Amino acid sequence: MNDQIIFEDVSKFYGEVLGVNRISLSIPPGITTLVGPNGSGKTTLMNLMTGLVQPSNGRISVMGLSPANSPELFRILGYCAQFDSFPRGITGWDFIFDSLMLHGMSEAEAFELTVESLERV
């Protein structure tokens, strides 16, 4: 089974502040938990993995794609941040439907997928 997430000698600096230093790790498919004390780099690793921030050094691969600039990756990757970011005043239905429309689906496709998605929860 191939590893789905690969960090190769990755470092991230925020100006003079070190976020993570020379991290190399491979994560196989499945459920993985990052555990550590405050300031240990858990959020930085997640932000690097999703492309929200770019590494200062090293290489990252998620499902064979670089998170640096990969629209393909964002079609298959979901990420829930540690803070609420759901827009106020919008329903779950509208949020899913509008997101699908923004990703180029037709109205009929977006409607069908929204219904299917909400039936799962």
Give the predicted meaning of each segment:
Residues 35-37:
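The feature captures the beta-strand-to-loop junction immediately N-terminal to the Walker
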Residues 33, 75-82, 97:
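ABC nucleotide-binding domain signature
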Residues 83, 89-102:
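Q-loop/switch helix immediately C-terminal to the Walker
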Residues 5-7, 20:
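Conserved structural motif at the start of ABC-family nucleotide-binding domains
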Residues 17-18, 71:
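Short coil-to-beta microelement around the adenine-binding A-loop and adjacent beta1/P-loop entry
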Residues 97, 101, 108-121:
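Conserved ABC ATPase "signature" region
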Residues 50:
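Helix-to-loop junction immediately C-terminal to a conserved catalytic motif
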Residues 58-73:
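Conserved ABC transporter NBD signature motif
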